[in-house]
């Protein structure tokens, strides 16, 4: 019975019900009341401080858990194999097992292969005994596979006893329609550039080539006159030699006829005519051996005329080499002008192209 009374008094002291205490207790001891008041104060202090400490411990636990989760995530990131594209080239970052550090490898998608990548890993870290690339389902990837083919799908990288799941970044590729549209835009830009600039460029080029052609023709004009004179002299000389050959053949015919029908008989002159004919064949063969050309009368005449022309040119001081160089340059310029004035390059309609071609024919006729 005493214990419940004490508890009731303590409860009343906490709630400041001193009047009730005096009702139940005939004699109130001041010392007991003071002790109860101290007990009440300590209880009140305990009640106010306990939640604050609890909240502090809870916040510390949350901070610790968050920091641990961040460190775990950073550690997991450092232990993964990542792929990034830098200036169009894939860069693979791999954690090295011996050095406990990450190393970045820059690869060429077309020229490098899986074997090259594995050799790079072994060369960078001598502690790597076994390194293999496999697909997600465990199929080994051949060393001859290109990096471009490897990065088309996700794969696994096995380094010693560690296995890494590698996520290949998806590359954006142009569709057929986009490529065709880009080609159409490129063609349109080229046509606009040609319409605005090419015609003017062609006119400037035509003026430049025409000026050069006129200059070379002026330089060639005195040489042409000199060459014409030499050709006339050589032509007369070659004609004279041709008539001289005909005269010699006539004399030969007359001598053989005289000996056959007047001086001797045919029985005597037949072997003579045979040797004369055979000697003529030997002379033709000797001509082939010396000139490396067949004995054809037109070719013989032209060759003789050319020899006479060079002989006369040396005597008169005519520079044949300069003449040939000027003729080659003029022929080249004329060819360039012909190509420049081609109706297909000018992109003219059919009627305009016909007019342009007629104009070129008239210019050639005037020349």
Swiss-Prot record:
Similarity field: Belongs to the MCU (TC 1.A.77) family.
Activity regulation description: MCU channel activity is regulated by the heterodimer composed of MICU1 and MICU2, which act as calcium-sensors. At low calcium levels, MICU1 occludes the pore of the MCU channel, preventing mitochondrial calcium uptake. At higher calcium levels, calcium-binding to MICU1 and MICU2 induces a conformational change that weakens MCU-MICU1 interactions and moves the MICU1-MICU2 heterodimer away from the pore, allowing calcium permeation through the channel.
Mitochondrial matrix side: 13-232, 285-367
Ligand binding (Ca(2+)): 270
Locus of motif Selectivity filter: 266-276
CC terms in the record's Gene Ontology section: uniplex complex
Keywords: Calcium, Calcium channel, Calcium transport, Coiled coil, Ion channel, Ion transport, Membrane, Metal-binding, Mitochondrion, Mitochondrion inner membrane, Transit peptide, Transmembrane, Transmembrane helix, Transport
Record note on quaternary structure: Homotetramer. Component of the uniplex complex, composed of MCU, EMRE, MICU1 and MICU2 in a 4:4:1:1 stoichiometry.
Membrane topology (Mitochondrial intermembrane): 254-262
Any one GO BP annotation for this protein: calcium import into the mitochondrion
Protein's membrane topology: Multi-pass membrane protein
Subcellular location as annotated: Mitochondrion inner membrane
Coiled-coil stretches noted in the UniProt entry, renumbered to this chain: 199-233
Transmembrane residue ranges: 233-253, 263-284
Name of the molecule in the record: Calcium uniporter protein, mitochondrial
Record function comment: Channel-forming and calcium-conducting subunit of the mitochondrial inner membrane calcium uniporter complex (uniplex), which mediates calcium uptake into the mitochondrial matrix. MCU channel activity is regulated by the calcium-sensor subunits of the uniplex MICU1 and MICU2. Mitochondrial calcium homeostasis plays key roles in cellular physiology and regulates ATP production, cytoplasmic calcium signals and activation of cell death pathways.
Organism: Tribolium castaneum (Red flour beetle)
Gene that this polypeptide is encoded by: MCU
Domain remark from Swiss-Prot or TrEMBL: The selectivity filter, in which calcium ions are arranged in single file, is composed of two acidic rings separated by one helical turn along the central axis of the channel pore.
PANTHER family the UniProt entry points to: CALCIUM UNIPORTER PROTEIN, MITOCHONDRIAL
One MF annotation (Gene Ontology) recorded for this entry: calcium channel activity
Region Disordered, residue ranges: 61-80
């Amino acid at each position: 019975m005493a214990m419940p009374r004490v508890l009731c008094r303590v409860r009343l002291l906490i709630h400041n019900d001193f009047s009730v205490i005096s009702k139940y207790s005939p004699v109130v001891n001041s010392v007991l009341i003071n002790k109860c008041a101290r007990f009440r104060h300590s209880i009140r202090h305990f009640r106010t401080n306990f939640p604050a400490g609890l909240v502090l411990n809870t916040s510390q636990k949350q901070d610790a858990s968050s920091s641990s989760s961040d460190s775990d995530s950073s550690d997991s990131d450092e232990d993964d194999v990542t792929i990034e594209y830098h200036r169009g080239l894939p860069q693979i970052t791999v954690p090295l097992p011996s050095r406990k550090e990450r190393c970045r490898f820059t690869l060429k998608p077309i020229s490098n292969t899986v074997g090259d990548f594995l050799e790079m890993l072994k060369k960078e870290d001598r502690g790597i005994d076994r390194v293999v690339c496999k697909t997600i389902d465990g199929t080994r990837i051949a060393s001859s596979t290109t990096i471009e083919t490897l990065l088309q799908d996700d794969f696994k990288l096995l380094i010693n006893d560690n296995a890494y799941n590698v996520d290949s970044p998806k590359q954006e590729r142009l569709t057929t329609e986009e490529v065709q549209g880009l080609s159409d835009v490129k063609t349109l830009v080229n046509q606009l550039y040609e319409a605005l600039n090419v015609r003017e460029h062609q006119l400037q080029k035509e003026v430049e080539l025409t000026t050069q052609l006129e200059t070379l023709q002026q330089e060639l004009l005195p040489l042409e006159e000199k060459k014409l004179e030499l050709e006339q002299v050589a032509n007369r000389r070659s004609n004279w030699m041709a008539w001289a050959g005909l005269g010699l053949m006539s004399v030969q015919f007359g001598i053989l006829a005289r000996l056959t029908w007047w001086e001797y008989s045919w029985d005597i002159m037949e072997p003579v005519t045979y040797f004369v004919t055979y000697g003529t064949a030997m002379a033709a063969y000797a001509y082939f051996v010396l000139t490396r050309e067949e004995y054809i009368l037109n070719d013989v005449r032209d060759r003789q005329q050319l020899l006479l022309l060079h002989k006369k040119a040396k005597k008169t001081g005519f520079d044949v080499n300069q003449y040939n160089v000027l003729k080659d340059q003029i022929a080249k310029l004329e060819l360039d002008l012909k190509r420049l004035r081609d109706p297909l390059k000018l992109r003219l309609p059919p009627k305009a192209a016909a007019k342009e071609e007629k104009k070129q024919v008239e210019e050639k006729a005037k020349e």
